[in-house]
Amino acid sequence: MNPNEVIIAVVRTQKAVSMIEKENKLTFIVRLEATKDDVKRAVEKLYGVKVEKVNTLITPRGEKKAYVKLKPEYKATELAIKLGVIV
């Protein structure tokens, strides 16, 4: 799957910002067809970071969320600032 097609949006909720700061995790809305491996490759290619782990879930609204934990040498806060999640 094309990396540009995998990620739909970055989640900007209070919980998502808290996870960025405390757990080095970013939250994305992704396509339902995307696998964890697709999400990992898309984040690594689009944002130039290394991913440690990906957890996914399908919300009651029918959206697929991906919680992406970055490797310790990368800071989720720096990427979040670039993406406009944190000002």
Predicted features along the sequence, with ranges:
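Contiguous, often N-terminal, cationic amphipathic patches that form binding interfaces
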Residues: 1-87
